[in-house]
Amino acid sequence: MWTMTKSLLIAILFFAAPEVFPQTLPEIQLLTRTSTRRETRRFAYGGTVTLIGAPRGSVTVEGWARNEVEVTANIELKGPTEADLDHLASVNTFVFDEDLNHISVLTTGTHDRMFMKRTAKNFPKKLLNLPWKIDYRLRVPANTDLEINAGHGPVKLSGVEGSMRLTATESETALTLTGGIVSATVTFGVITFSIPSRSWRGSGADIRIASGTINVDLPPGFSGDIDAEVLRTGKIVNTYEGLASREKPGITERIVRSRAGAGGPYFKFTVGDGTVNIRKGGGT
């Protein structure tokens, strides 16, 4: 009898335990702090601007008519307490590295082990893996060379003509350009490459994505040589009526060797796994 009673009590305690003793601890509610930092530097036409972005956050770069570089950074931090947010704010930010014809905007933060070892040796370890991001907006002289290294987040580039090199980890990237020498590589996401004018001032562009989609928007009457290729799986969809075969194999679902109008600047679009859409866009 005692054995049966003991077993019954154990069973009751077992099923009642979730109400008396919670099986999981409540999640710690993180505080959020947002701040905006804006900096301006004098800068002549024809120089180089480098941005090393945050692991997460958007990047927008616009060309303008001033001899200045303007950097606006919207910084979002998360931490358990205000004191923790103060610690994070001291490291998750950006610094300038400048010389006569080159300005670098360098993101610092908990993602950079070398930086943390060098400048924040006593930083609390519990804060190292907390989420944070920086959304950058840069305005640069229109004739500027660019080097952009982005992480996870949208990228927009417009109104700049120069030598431009862009890399991103995961991004919806929008490039609206009328000239320059462009190289863009994205690991995963979507790249939309738009040319709003019929002529391109410069030698062309090389656009690559490992997995995802490349959209190519060409205006009516555009002139240029267009190549596209799918390396593994996927296809090329061409709905732009102005393309003609330039050399073998011509225009297929896997490879395109084509010419628009009178030809000229050279554009290459490469997808590892995904789709290349060549289509009619707006423009003048």
Spans of features found by a protein language model:
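Intrinsically disordered, low-complexity terminal regions
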Residues: 2-284
